[in-house]
């Protein structure tokens, strides 16, 4: 009945019970629902145990008794014997038993409220520490505090009605709060009907029964109310009637039925400039008592209380105006009206005199506020001066000028009543930037905000867009700058993309995120694209627009639907009007900066920019007013502005919280958003952080193992990733690739990876010429690599290079490819599809990449067909002296740079005379390539260029460095692209026409292997062989990453062999193939380690960037032991199968080799082993194999350029791409090199894989396959291949059942055997070739070896090709090789090693989207996004990107990535002596034994530098025959097409000791025989090669796939 009205003074029921003494029995009133059940339990004279029926006299006894039941059970799981709930500890269980006994042993000494725990009581006691009368009047709690308040002790909300709807616990606690205030005031309970005073609530309740007929009904309109408070408010708001005492005076401040305090005003911030006005209107509508002893702002006229003096003054003015209005009514007949001009002026401002307002005074006040708020809602996305009064209180007249319908603006009475009856219970949040945000808050939260339905009703008639009048109509004085703006109250949308909400977000979150502050009113459609014109855009629009597009759309980016666009001056003025301090505030930027563009205009712009339909773009762009950057999110802009102002980038936009890092900020933001992304799959309990969810699973569901816990945690991707992106502070975000590096220092280090120029590495080691970006890195290098240097002399070994001289050389060529080279300080930004804002050069004509070419769905292949149509439109300065003009569009500049390549100009200073002369000859060809940091153009599987990351080139950045934050565009979020990291689209650069290739190919041999073996998807790849030849050749056109002319020549020959490719490509790649250039580069390049078959991803481009390939990352993340079951085998089977099921040469493996390998294996005694399908390593755990598998993809890539000079073959076979084509080549083309390839030990293959990896860049294997370095072949002929049986252990290769008569090799298929025999025959034919066509051989070799290499690759098992530097390299060039190598390696090494320190542990921001489930491998490579289990794995992997080789051989100064590689290499030095002494037999035996070791060790770590290990070994063996190399090279000219691979075999022979049966006779020749052998080697049976070709063609698709990755081309020599 009426007792609810009296709850004002109640103390919580649970406060009335003591621990052991029962409270006096009471008769609860019918509607007292507080703890009714609890009370009845307390009233009982006895308490019964639910388990054993024992009767206890007190609750405490019952508690102690039921606790004994728990100990009786003796369980260790701490589960409740009554309800079975499992708790974490015995103490928690004891505390839990209070729930069943009902005892609340801890009681507040002030208010009597009782609690189950001491901590809860003490927390409660804090509310009594201050005088409650002084707590609330002047300092409404902050939104966060108020939110916390609501759950624990909700102060009286506006309506008793609301309290009745709340849960009993909350209501009771709330009542207790009222009681506190009242009792301190007058310790009495008042009857709201007769105003009698009572000393206890029970007396009051009894008294209320004497008023049974007192119905709460309005006397005027007969509306009935459930609570007295509701009636009071109704009378005050509707009828302007205030409660009055018997004398007729307003009776508010002493009326106990009126709520005390102003806590309800917590919906807005008291620091808000409009707070006095808001509080005045609100307190006039909602009667409140002032409970402060000191700050009592009470109106003497109407007895209303206000929280602050200013609100009271505003209120008293209304009384004065009322009086004035009464006088005015009396005088209205005689007095003339005010000046009509003045009235018109006031009306134009949306103002009128209050005396002209209708008598319903308070309602009109509310009406003003409502109108103001509605205008805010309507104009929230309009640029304006935040807080400018002219725009805030727009009259209908002004609103009409703004394009809004007249009818929308004047609020109707219904709307006013909606708000006045429930003032702001679910109200607006008025933002400091004049925008309004609406978010429904659940009843439990303290800040009750606007009901969505109300707002929808009010905003329903709003036009989709209300455009701003020209700025001149807006007041130009920054009114709000006088005030310190309040921080935004409403949880902002966490700076998530406004137009996209993750589908998995729970519904409340969706509405919360969509209602973005100051952006979009809930009922309005998202505003269309807004493009802000930059001061520079006008000059660059012609360059930015598509050739076919008209310039008008691009030059008029400031399209507005209904008003004239702002001029640049107006925009500048508008931005300048904002004070700096506003930049601190989250929201005030949005309204000023945004401009509307209709969807039609947007389509016109897009249609103009791209000839085909483009996917949807971001709707809004936000320019920075301090620099020229443009952002797609206001949150990103705010974060960016903080960086201008030196404020922490990780500052909460909602409150004052400043996080130390982004992760802490994200966790904090969840407290505002309510987001709980970690969900228990069993009971759907959500957690804000994973640890909470894990604890929940352990405690509640008894999940103890990590596997069970992980399995039952679901991560709901709502907006965390977008939050991350939005909070990317531009001072930590890479502008070129969008990567957020978390720290500015890491960003600086990272930026070096984009500027591949030597000038970024000013510190050079005088010993080896390696350049470093930081001096400390150079010192570290000297300490580790040059041990003879004393520490005190280190400074003398560091050369500081001045780069200014080189810039002049590089500038001109760089103009062609430098997307980011800005001569002007301001760079206009276009927004590409993938959401990264890329700057385009404002002065260099550059073809804009048609946006339509880049599908939003990354699963689609890229479509570059537009490129081939518009190539003529590309305007590029033609700087290349030797490239013909038609080919000027095809430059090295179009390819991803190889960061480890030293610049030619830089190297010129260091190269001694002889090499220098030769280099100059070649530098004519390669000069531009160096200047442009040659980027091999990788073609994707369908022949399209792989998505090349926009990487900086060696030019200086002339403008200020603009850091752009990664943006997620809506289309991206909606599609499968969420599953992989967001990648920048390739920069607008012209690319080659699409080659005539129709089939997609796997990007890497290793990927093909893994897909076929792990995912059992051979069908994915089996049909792709036919197209390989044209593809491989065309993709090889990219300049070799090592930047030498040799690579170009070999590429050219490959292209020439391919009739499908335009001849001009050949010209571009091979302008002047000359032996001199070849040798010069050979010498110059020195010892480069090859890398594995996978592309180097230093620029961060993901392998799946084009969407064409399976994600190895995802695949491995989901593999389990079962997937590897084919590779499980017992220890016995292991030795047996490794011989039989290995590669075709496995039968030759000697028992000693197997034994060695068995000893080597860490898990050799393990009962079951998992053999890596791609190398001989064996693992006891599937997880170890999974981790190791990455070494066959991206993990261990050596990022140094391969030594094109001769040490390193481009060893990847392109066979997987050309299985059919190879057989169609002239029979002679598959030379002994293929035999060698077929027979080389696994270590060889590993090395070859690595060699490729480097050259490929983001290309497929075929690219580097075609780029086989021919000089290498010529040098290899100086070496013996010691015979060795290779140990492969690859279970992917099956048994061979057919043996070759000539070499004893076995094959699985008869057809393969017959082809193999033909190869022997063909080899004989080849030997008859003369040596006079050397240059031709050199050119043609490039294509043939790579194609031939692929031919045999399928049968061969992994081989560790030990390639040794010829004397020509080791001795003739000597130091040059080291220098060139270390420089190219060093650049990559230092660039990434410095970056690695801060980056390698930091997962990319977008990683959250890259996998559907959380990947347990927490260490993520920042370059290629590969994941690793441990930091050690990642560190080792990073060396593949950086080129770091921390281990150095003291004998030959070779450097190695892995320590065990160095150890193995040092063994070679010992064995080389024996090789020289004992001749061919001992050589053979040693290499046999070492083959097992090397193949195992090298492949086990993906052999980051297998090739380098033996190079020096054989320098001695062949050291005295440099002329032999030259003569052999000449002799190869004639045999180039027939013996393309043959030449390389000898160099591998003596040197590598990784040999094969077929090469025995050759191997047995002493080193001295090698020189004459230049021609003799040509006499090998060509039938063997023919045989190999046939075998290759008939190979099964699976074998072909596996072989292509497993056995990269081995150099076979057939005697």
From Swiss-Prot:
Q: Name one GO cellular component term.
A: nucleus
Compositionally skewed regions (Polar residues) per UniProt: 15-28, 535-549, 1123-1132
Renumbered to this chain, the Acidic residues biased-composition regions fall at 1242-1262
Where do Basic residues bias regions lie? 145-154, 1082-1095, 1464-1477
Bias type Low complexity, positions: 1026-1036
Xref: InterPro entries? RREB1, Znf_C2H2_sf, Znf_C2H2_type
Instruction: State the residue spans of region: Disordered.
Output: 1-44, 127-169, 511-556, 1025-1044, 1058-1104, 1123-1162, 1214-1269, 1313-1418, 1464-1585
Give residue spans, biased composition: Basic and acidic residues. Answer: 1321-1339, 1388-1414, 1478-1493, 1566-1580
Q: Which cysteines are joined by disulfide bonds?
A: none
Q: What are the start-end ranges of the zinc fingers (C2H2-type)?
A: 47-69, 78-100, 106-128, 189-211, 216-239, 297-319, 622-644, 650-672, 732-754, 763-788, 1170-1192, 1298-1320, 1419-1441, 1447-1469
What GO biological process terms does the UniProt entry carry, in alphabetical order? Answer: regulation of transcription by RNA polymerase II
Record keyword Repeat present: yes
Sorted keywords for this record are:
DNA-binding, Metal-binding, Nucleus, Repeat, Transcription, Transcription regulation, Zinc, Zinc-finger
Which tissues is this chain's protein expressed in?
Answer: Broadly expressed, except in brain.
Q: Name one GO molecular function term.
A: RNA polymerase II cis-regulatory region sequence-specific DNA binding
Q: Where in the cell is it found?
A: Nucleus
What domain of life does the native source organism fall in? Eukaryota
Any one Pfam family here would be zf-C2H2
Q: Where is it chiefly localized?
A: nucleus
- Which family is annotated? Belongs to the krueppel C2H2-type zinc-finger protein family.
Main function: Transcription factor that binds specifically to the RAS-responsive elements (RRE) of gene promoters.
Q: What's the protein here called?
A: Ras-responsive element-binding protein 1
């Amino acid at each position: 009945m009426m007792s609810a009205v009296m709850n004002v003074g109640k103390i919580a029921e649970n406060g009335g019970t003591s621990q052991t003494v029962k409270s006096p029995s009471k008769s609860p009133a019918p509607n007292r629902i507080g703890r009714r059940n609890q009370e009845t339990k307390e009233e009982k004279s006895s308490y019964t145990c639910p388990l054993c029926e024992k009767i206890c006299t007190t609750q405490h006894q019952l508690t102690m008794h039921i606790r004994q039941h728990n100990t009786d059970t003796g369980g260790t799981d701490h589960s409740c014997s009554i309800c079975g709930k499992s708790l974490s500890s015995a103490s928690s269980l004891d505390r839990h038993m209070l729930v069943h006994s009902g005892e609340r042993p801890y009681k507040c000494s002030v208010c009597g409220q009782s609690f189950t725990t001491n901590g809860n009581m003490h927390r409660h006691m804090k509310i009594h520490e201050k005088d409650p009368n002084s707590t609330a009047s002047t300092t409404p709690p902050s939104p966060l505090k108020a939110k916390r308040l609501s759950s624990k002790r909700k102060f009286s909300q506006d309506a008793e009605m609301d309290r009745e709807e709340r849960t009993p616990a909350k209501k009771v606690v709330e009542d207790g709060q009222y009681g506190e205030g009242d009792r301190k005031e007058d310790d009495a309970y008042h009857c709201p009907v007769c105003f009698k005073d009572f000393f206890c609530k029970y007396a009051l309740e009894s008294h209320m029964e004497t008023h049974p007929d007192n119905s709460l009904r309005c006397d005027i309109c007969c509306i009935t109310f459930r609570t007295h408070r509701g009636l009071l408010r109704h009378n005050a708001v509707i009828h302007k009637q205030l409660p009055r005492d018997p004398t007729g005076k307003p009776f508010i401040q002493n009326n106990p039925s009126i709520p005390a305090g102003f806590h309800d005003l917590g919906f807005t911030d008291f620091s808000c400039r409009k707070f006095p006005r808001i509080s005045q209107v609100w307190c006039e509508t909602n009667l409140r008592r002032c409970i402060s002893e000191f700050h009592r702002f009470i109106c003497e006229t109407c007895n209303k209380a206000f929280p602050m003096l200013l609100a009271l003054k505003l209120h008293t003015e209304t009384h004065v105006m009322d009086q004035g209005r009464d006088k005015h009514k009396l005088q209205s007949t005689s007095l003339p009206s005010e000046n009509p001009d003045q009235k018109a002026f006031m009306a134009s401002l949306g103002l009128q005199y209050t005396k002209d307002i209708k008598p319903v005074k308070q309602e009109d006040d509310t009406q003003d506020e409502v109108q103001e708020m509605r205008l805010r809602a309507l104009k929230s996305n309009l640029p304006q001066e935040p807080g400018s009064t002219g725009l805030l209180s727009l009259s209908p007249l002004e609103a009409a000028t703004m394009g809004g319908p007249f009818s929308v603006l004047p609020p109707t009475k219904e709307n006013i009543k909606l708000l006045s009856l429930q003032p702001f219970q679910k109200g607006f949040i008025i933002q400091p930037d004049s925008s309004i945000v609406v978010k429904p808050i659940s009843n439990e939260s303290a800040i009750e905000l606007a009901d969505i339905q109300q707002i929808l009703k009010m905003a329903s008639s709003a036009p989709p867009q209300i455009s701003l009048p020209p700025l001149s109509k807006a007041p130009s004085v920054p009114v709000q700058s006088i005030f310190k703006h309040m921080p935004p109250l409403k949880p902002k949308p966490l700076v998530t993309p406004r137009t996209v909400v993750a589908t998995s977000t729970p519904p409340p979150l969706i509405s919360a995120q969509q209602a973005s502050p100051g952006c979009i009113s809930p009922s309005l459609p998202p505003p269309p694209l807004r493009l802000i014109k930059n001061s520079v855009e006008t000059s660059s629009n012609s360059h930015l627009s598509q050739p076919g597009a008209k310039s008008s759309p691009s030059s008029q980016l400031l399209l507005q639907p209904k008003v004239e666009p702002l001029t640049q001056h107006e925009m500048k003025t508008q931005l300048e009007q904002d004070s700096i301090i506003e930049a601190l505030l989250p929201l005030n930027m949005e309204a000023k900066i945004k401009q509307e563009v209709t969807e039609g205009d947007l389509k016109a712009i897009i249609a103009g920019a791209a000839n085909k339909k483009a996917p949807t773009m971001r709707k809004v762009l936000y320019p920075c007013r301090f620099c020229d950057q443009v952002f797609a999110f206001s949150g990103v802009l705010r974060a960016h502005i903080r960086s201008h102002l030196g404020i922490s980038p990780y500052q909460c936009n909602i409150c004052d919280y400043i996080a130390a890092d982004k992760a802490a900020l994200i966790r904090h933001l969840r407290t505002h958003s309510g987001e709980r992304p970690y969900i228990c799959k069993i009971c759907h309990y959500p957690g804000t952080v994973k640890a909470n969810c894990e604890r929940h699973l352990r405690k509640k569901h008894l999940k103890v193992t990590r596997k069970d816990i992980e399995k039952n945690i679901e991560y709901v991707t709502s907006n965390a990733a977008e939050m991350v992106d939005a909070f990317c502070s531009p001072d930590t975000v890479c502008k070129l690739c969008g990567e957020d590096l978390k720290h500015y220092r890491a960003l600086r280090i990272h930026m070096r990876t984009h500027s591949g120029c030597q000038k970024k590495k000013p510190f050079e080691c005088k010993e080896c010429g390696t350049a470093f970006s930081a001096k400390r890195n150079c010192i570290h290098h000297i300490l580790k690599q040059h041990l003879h240097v004393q520490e005190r002399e280190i400074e003398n070994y560091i050369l500081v290079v001045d780069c200014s001289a080189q810039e002049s050389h590089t500038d001109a060529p760089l103009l062609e490819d430098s997307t980011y080279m800005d001569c002007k300080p301001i760079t206009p930004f276009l927004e590409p599809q993938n959401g990264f804002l890329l700057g385009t050069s404002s002065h260099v004509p550059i073809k804009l990449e048609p946006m339509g070419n880049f599908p939003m769905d990354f699963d689609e292949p890229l479509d570059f067909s537009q490129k081939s149509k518009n190539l003529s439109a590309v305007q590029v300065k033609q700087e290349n002296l030797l490239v013909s003009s038609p080919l000027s569009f095809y430059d090295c500049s179009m390819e991803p740079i190889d960061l480890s390549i030293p610049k030619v100009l830089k190297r010129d200073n260091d190269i001694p005379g002889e090499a220098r002369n030769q280099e100059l000859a070649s530098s004519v060809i390669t000069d531009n390539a160096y200047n442009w940091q040659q980027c091999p153009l990788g073609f994707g599987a369908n022949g399209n260029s792989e998505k090349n990351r926009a990487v900086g080139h060696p030019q200086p950045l002339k403008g200020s460095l603009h850091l752009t934050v990664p943006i997620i565009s809506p289309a991206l979020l909606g599609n499968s692209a969420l599953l992989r990291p967001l990648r920048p689209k390739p920069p607008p650069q012209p690319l080659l026409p699409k080659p005539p290739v129709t089939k997609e190919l796997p990007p890497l041999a290793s990927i093909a292997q893994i897909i076929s073996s792990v995912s059992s998807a051979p069908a994915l790849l089996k049909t792709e062989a036919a197209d390989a030849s044209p593809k491989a050749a065309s993709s090889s056109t990219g300049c070799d990453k090592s930047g030498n002319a040799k690579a170009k020549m070999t590429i050219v020959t490959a292209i020439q062999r391919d009739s499908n490719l335009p001849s001009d490509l050949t010209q571009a790649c091979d302008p002047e193939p000359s032996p001199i250039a070849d040798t010069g580069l050979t010498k110059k390049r020195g010892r480069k380690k090859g890398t594995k078959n996978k592309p180097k991803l230093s620029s961060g481009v993901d392998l799946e960037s084009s969407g064409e390939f399976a994600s190895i990352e995802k695949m491995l993340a989901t593999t389990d032991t079962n997937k590897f079951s084919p590779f499980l085998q017992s220890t016995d089977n292991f030795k047996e199968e490794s011989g039989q099921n290995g590669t075709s040469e496995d039968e030759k493996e000697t028992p000693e080799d197997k034994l060695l390998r068995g000893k080597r294996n860490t898990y050799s005694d393990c009962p079951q082993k998992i053999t890596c399908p791609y190398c001989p390593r064996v693992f006891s755990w599937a997880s170890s194999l999974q981790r190791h598998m990455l070494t066959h993809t991206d993990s261990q890539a050596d990022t140094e350029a391969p030594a094109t000079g001769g040490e390193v073959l481009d060893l990847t076979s392109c066979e997987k791409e050309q299985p059919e084509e190879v057989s169609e080549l002239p029979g002679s083309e598959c030379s002994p090199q293929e035999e060698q390839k077929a027979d080389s030990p696994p270590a060889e293959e590993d090395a070859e894989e690595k060699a490729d990896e480097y050259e490929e860049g983001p290309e497929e294997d075929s690219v580097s396959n075609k780029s086989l370095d021919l000089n290498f072949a010529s040098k290899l002929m100086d070496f013996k291949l010691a015979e060795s049986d290779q140990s492969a252990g690859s279970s992917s290769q099956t048994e061979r059942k057919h043996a070759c008569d000539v070499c004893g090799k076995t094959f699985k298929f008869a057809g393969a055997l017959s082809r193999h025999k033909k190869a022997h025959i063909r080899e004989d034919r080849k030997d008859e070739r003369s040596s006079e066509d050397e240059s031709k051989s050199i050119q043609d070799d490039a294509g043939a070896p790579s194609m031939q290499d692929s031919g045999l690759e399928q049968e061969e098992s992994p081989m560790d090709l030990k390639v040794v530097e010829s004397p020509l390299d080791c001795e003739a060039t000597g130091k040059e090789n080291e220098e060139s190598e270390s420089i190219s390696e060093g650049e990559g090494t230092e660039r990434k090693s410095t970056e690695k320190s801060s980056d390698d542990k930091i997962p990319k921001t977008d990683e959250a989207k890259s996998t559907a489930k959380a990947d347990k491998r927490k260490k993520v490579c920042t370059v290629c996004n590969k994941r690793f289990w441990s930091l050690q794995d990642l560190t080792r992997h990073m060396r593949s990107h950086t080129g770091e080789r921390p281990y150095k051989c003291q004998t030959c100064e070779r450097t190695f990535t892995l320590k065990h590689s160095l150890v193995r290499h040092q063994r070679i030095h010992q064995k080389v002596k024996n090789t020289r002494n004992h001749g061919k037999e001992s050589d053979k035996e040693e290499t046999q034994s070492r083959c097992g070791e090397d193949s195992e060790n090298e492949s086990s770590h993906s052999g980051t530098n297998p090739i380098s290990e033996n190079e020096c070994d054989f320098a001695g063996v062949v050291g005295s025959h440099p002329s032999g190399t030259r003569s052999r090279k000449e002799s190869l000219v004639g045999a180039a097409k027939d013996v393309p691979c043959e030449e390389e075999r000898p160099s591998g022979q003596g040197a590598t000791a990784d040999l094969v049966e077929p090469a025995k006779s050759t191997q047995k020749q002493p080193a001295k025989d090698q020189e004459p052998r230049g021609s003799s080697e040509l006499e090998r049976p060509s039938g063997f090669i023919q045989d190999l070709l046939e075998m290759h063609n008939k190979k099964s698709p699976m074998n072909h796939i596996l072989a292509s990755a497993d056995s990269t081309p081995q150099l076979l020599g057939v005697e």
